[in-house]
Curated annotation (Swiss-Prot):
One of its GO terms (cellular component) is cytoplasm. It catalyses: phosphoenolpyruvate + UDP-N-acetyl-alpha-D-glucosamine = UDP-N-acetyl-3-O-(1-carboxyvinyl)-alpha-D-glucosamine + phosphate. It comes from Shigella boydii serotype 18 (strain CDC 3083-94 / BS512). This is UDP-N-acetylglucosamine 1-carboxyvinyltransferase. GO terms for biological process: cell division; cell wall organization; peptidoglycan biosynthetic process; regulation of cell shape; UDP-N-acetylgalactosamine biosynthetic process. UDP-N-acetyl-alpha-D-glucosamine binds at residues 91, 120-124, 160-163, 305, 327. The active site is at 115 (proton donor). Cell wall formation. Adds enolpyruvyl to UDP-N-acetylglucosamine. Its EC number is 2.5.1.7.
Length: 419
């Protein structure tokens, strides 16, 4: 397995170009199964999960190629099963189910894998599709969905806010007969992006970005060209990198209005932040950040995917900060690893109490999930001595060329090929 060897401490400064959002690119790739004409998707990040998704679409019979943009022609899809060998590494594959059953009347997906952070059940996807008229069976580790004729529009009230299930229901409802209303829908920018992609293909959707999405079913979706929005979590990660190293950074190809909660907390931490239409700059003026209190919750509140990075920020900040995680259980696996580097933290239920220290020391640490592993790499950049981060395949699932981008900011980081 590959590792990162990071030599610190370094002050990170310079410019970084933000990639397309993984969490928008994946649902958009699967939503392309709904299209009866070719689609071109621009600004798709080069990531393991994206490669897996493209491979899965090919196995279903779609023509998929990448030359800068990703081109998908789903006219000849003739396989309706997403097999275990592709699905086991990636939760996003559940998003194949809604489009398959909506367009072809049948679909089956192996129960998914991905990061092991707490319970991420597929129940909400299943109950949403059932309310649209699909028959669902769980057999031999597969979720199997079928419908005679078309799905039927429905008034669906989500039990809890779920990005994944909102995507599934919204995609399936585009080809349903009649109107579907999703109440308590997720409001994330990536939901808005997926809806806007579907609208480009001819879907009739309104209310995306609010907790009530209305979809009027159409008979077919055509093709089109669409550009994926910038990755707000990658943007936030690089902003934190500059903040903890007392540096300065400009993030290009960013979308500031998707990061309001994160930018507010960085300002609280003492960062000088400016934004333009597609850029964000952060300057610490050489100062150490101040500890901040953070509580994660669904958008537009503070994103759970930035929790590990802010835990690290608090652990090297002036003062004591509290980080409360309300979205996922079991999402503090980075804390014991950071403690190996000299961080002072206590976990009480779903809160980490962070006592800031002046400096961290390099150590051998292990990545446990995607965002936790990013925080360990950033910790290595500012720690004294050498840090080796193991199991970095987690990072490759969500960050495009993170070592190249960090190196351009002054980090001393090398990928060491595993046995």
């Amino acid at each position: 397995m590959d590792k990162f060897r990071v030599q610190g401490p370094t002050k990170l400064q310079g410019e970084v170009t933000i990639s397309g959002a993984k969490n928008a690119a994946l649902p958009i790739l699967f939503a392309a199964l709904l299209a009866e004409e070719p689609v071109e998707i621009q600004n798709v990040p080069k990531l393991k999960d994206v490669d897996t998704s493209m491979k899965l679409l090919s196995q279903l019979g779609a023509k998929v190629e990448r030359n800068g943009s990703v081109h998908i022609d789903a006219r000849d899809v003739n396989v309706f099963c997403a097999p275990y060998d592709l699905v086991k590494t990636m939760r996003a594959s559940i998003w194949a189910l809604g489009p398959l059953v909506a367009r072809f009347g049948q679909g089956q997906v192996s129960l998914p894998g991905g990061c092991t952070i707490g319970a991420r059940p597929v129940d909400l996807h299943i109950s949403g599709l059932e309310q649209l008229g699909a028959t669902i069976k769980l057999e031999e580790g597969y979720v199997k969905a079928s419908v005679d004729g078309r799905l039927k529009g429905a008034h669906i009230v989500m039990d809890k806010v779920s990005v994944g299930a909102t995507v599934t229901i919204m995609c399936a409802a585009t080809l349903a007969e009649g109107t579907t209303i999703i109440e308590n829908a997720a409001r994330e920018p990536e939901i808005v992006d997926t809806a806007n992609f579907l609208i480009t293909l001819g879907a009739k959707i309104s209310g995306q970005g609010t907790d009530r999405i209305v979809i009027e079913g159409v008979e077919r979706l055509g093709g089109g060209v669409y550009r994926v929005l910038p990755d707000r979590i990658e943007t936030g990660t690089f902003l934190v990198a500059a903040a903890i190293s007392r540096g300065k950074i400009i993030c290009r190809n960013a979308q500031p209005d998707t990061l309001d909660a994160v930018l507010a907390k960085l300002r609280d931490a003492g960062a000088d932040i400016e934004v333009g239409e597609d850029w964000i700059s952060l300057d610490m003026h050489g100062k150490r950040p101040k500890a901040v209190n953070v509580r994660t919750a669904p958008h537009p509140a503070f994103p759970t995917d930035m929790q590990a990075q802010f835990t690290l920020l608090n652990l090297v900040a002036e003062g004591t900060g509290f980080i409360t995680e309300t979205v996922f259980e079991n999402r503090f696996m980075h804390v014991p690893e950071l403690s190996r580097m000299g961080a002072h933290a206590e976990i009480e239920s779903n809160t980490v109490i962070c006592h800031g220290v002046e400096k961290l020391s390099g150590a051998q640490v292990m990545a446990t999930d995607l965002r936790a592993s990013a925080s360990l790499v950033l910790a290595g950049c500012i720690a004294e001595g050498t840090t080796v981060v193991d199991r970095i395949y987690h990072i490759d699932r969500g960050y495009e060329r993170i070592e190249d981008k960090l190196r351009a900011l002054g980090a001393n980081i090398k990928r060491v090929k595993g046995e």
